[in-house]
Each structure stands twice: as C-alpha cells, then as structure tokens.
Amino acid sequence: MDYKAPRRYYSHGVVARQQDFATDIVTRRRPYVPYDRPNKFSRSLVWTSKEYKSPEGNNMPRTNDVSPKPPVLGLARKNAACGPMRSSSLRKWVCKYWKDGKCKRGEQCQFLHSWSCFPGLAMVASLEGHNKELKGIALPEGSDKLFSVSIDGTLRVWDCNSGQCVHSINLDAEAGSLISEGPWVFLGLPNAIKAFNVQTSQDLHLQAAGVVGQVNAMTIANGMLFAGTSSGSILVWKATTDSESDPFKYLTSLEGHSGEVTCFAVGGQMLYSGSVDKTIKMWDLNTLQCIMTLKQHTGTVTSLLCWDKCLISSSLDGTIKVWAYSENGILKVVQTRRQEQSSVHALSGMHDAEAKPIIFCSYQNGTVGIFDLPSFQERGRMFSTHTIATLTIGPQGLLFSGDESGNLRVWTLAAGNKV
C-alpha cells in the first residue's frame, strides 16, 4: 500500500497529508478530540504506587479509572503455542526441542513445554507477518486496532477481534520506534515523526530541523512530545489545542548526549533519557534543562522505568540498576542485579492479580525474568525463540512482546489468580 499523499504545509515544521493511510485504518470519522492528557497505560509513567512523591515533596496523584477493555484477538488464539503450565521450581527453562516442535519426551521431559511459567500469565495470540526485529507495539486508547512496526520497513495494523492483519503499509524507510498516547499514534522515522489520530483520521508529518537521524525512542510528558534520535539530540514538540489542523508545534532540541538516544522514562516532573554513550540524563520538565548525568553503566542503556520514588535502568553491560534519591537530592545506585552472560534489552512493569508490582526484564538469550518489586525476588519467566526487543503494557492485564525475528505475542495476566 502506498501511503504517500498530497501535502499541505503549516508553520512549525508540520506537514499535513490529505486522505493518507490513517483514513484506511479508520472506517468512520469521530468528533475531534484534542490531545490534552497522557495515556494512562503508557509504560513510561510511574505505574506502581498510588501516589508518587517527587524529590521536592510534591504529591503526584494517580487516577484509578480504566477504559473499557478491548477484545483480545480472539480468533488468533489458535496460533498460541501455550502448553500446560508447569509449577515445579525445577522447570525454569523451556525445552529447546519443544520450541522447534521436535521434543519426543512429552510430559516426561524435564524442561518446560510452555512459553511461560508464571501463574495466571497466558499467551493468547502469536501474530506473524513481520520478518525482522520489532521496534514498537501500540494499542491506542479506545481503539480495536493494534499497531506494530519493524525494521523490515512495514507498519502492520491488526484487528483485535479476529487477530488478522488488516493493513500492511510499506513505509519506504526503516522504522525506529512507535508509541500511542490517547487517540494519537506516533511513528519514528529517519529525520521525522509521523503522527495520526485513529478517531479523526488526521495525519501529520512532524519534520525535524536539519538532519538528526533515526528517531529511536519517543515519549510524552507535560503536553510535550520528546523524540530521541541517532544523533544524540532530543527533539521536542508542544501539543496545542487551538487548531485541529496544527496540533503540534516544534519547540526546541535538547543537547547533551554524545551517542544515540535509546530510551525514555518519566517520573514526577523529570524526564530521563538513556543513550549509547552509557549515560542517563535527567531533565527538568519545567525548564527543559539537564540537571544531572548518571554514569554507572558500562554499556549502552537499553531501557528505563520509573517505579515509586526510584528509577530502574537496564544495559547491554548485563546489569539492572535501581536508583534512589539520597538525602541531598542526588540519584544514586542502591541495588544492582547482574545477569551473567546475557545483556538486558527491555524493561516493563505492571501489577499482578493481587495488585503487587512486578517487573519484566528481557535478556539476550530470549528469556524474560519476572520479579517482585522492590525485592527483585524471581516470580517466573517468559520465553521466546529470539531476544524480545520490546515490551508494551496494555489495559487490564494485557502485555505485548515483540522479538528480533518479528514475532509479536499477546499475553494476558488473569485477574483474581493467587500468586
């Protein structure tokens, strides 16, 4: 499908495309909804405690309201190779022959014949279509369409009712990242961001000033869109509500990283950015100034997550670090967890059935460790044939994983199970 269309130029570096592929995705138009709040399912928000207290002592309340749960890819369940759950503590590794469909031992096998060993966690769909590493998965709020992008240069749209791919769009470029906030979907491309609204079919091309390279990571905070690039710059757009045709205004560029920006997290009034330069920078969301640089990792920082009053980071150096504020307001490492002989590629967090916080940690060997917070006691594991490169939390117990082979899996954590 060719997504190109006639352009109409606006100020502030925004290009609108008329009758673009967002029109194909949405069958009917809905009243325009301005962007005025973050998506409560964003993985970059503080998702555990009901109230977050910033270093300055300001309380950050959470909302407990939830949106209606979308259908969970019902017809795709036939693709889910979920074997019976093994509860034995000795069976912590999936059988490599079973993964290839060649194990002859059956129930007598000493290894797991399941893609997970966490009570209540089940894989409900395996979506096949991409043939290279997934760079992002997004389920827009209120939508029954799931979006995924890959370095194979395609954007795929999946119907949540049937589990079928309803659109495969050739981007003519390698995708770098994908997120959703409210009704908006943001796609990171070389030197630009494509934004479209699933409710109104509005389709925009946010053009960066100059050559900044691939957009590797994005997040939204305080009504601003932040985009981390391969040049080390962080581009900032401000969301506006005064014009339906020009909802995002280019604001500035944050400089400081000497290598590619790889990940973001938001906690309180702070933006955290990780980079190939092995550092984490802390930016004040009110002034957009860098107020601290953290240098404890010895490899690329791959993922960041805010939990309660802490920052959690992962790296290709094989460590997961927990950072907390000291009495003088400095972030310091209070815990380091090392994964022997395996780098750490992605982090994500959610609550279990008892509303206890758990964290998912993806390792290079295709395993995802599931741990309690703050103890980091292991609770279970997920498995894949390749490294899981992206983990995205959805509404009401949904979890999406995408690996380096292009396989996209949908998981659900059953409510009410005792864990």
Swiss-Prot record:
Molecular functions (GO terms): DNA binding; zinc ion binding
Q: Where are the zinc fingers (C3H1-type)?
A: 89-116
State the source organism's domain of life. Eukaryota
Which sections of the protein are WD repeats?
A: 129-168, 210-247, 256-293, 296-335, 383-419
The record's annotation in InterPro entries points to: G-protein_beta_WD-40_rep, WD40/YVTN_repeat-like_dom_sf, WD40_repeat_CS, WD40_repeat_dom_sf, WD40_rpt, WDR86-like, Znf_CCCH, Znf_CCCH_sf
User: Which UniProt key words apply to this protein?
Assistant: DNA-binding, Metal-binding, Repeat, WD repeat, Zinc, Zinc-finger
What SMART domains has UniProt attached to this entry?
WD40 (SM00320), ZnF_C3H1 (SM00356)
**The keyword Repeat is assigned to this record:** yes
Q: Which PANTHER family match?
A: PTHR44489, ZINC FINGER CCCH DOMAIN-CONTAINING PROTEIN 59-RELATED
Protein name, as recorded: Zinc finger CCCH domain-containing protein 62
Q: What is the lineage of its organism?
A: Eukaryota, Viridiplantae, Streptophyta, Embryophyta, Tracheophyta
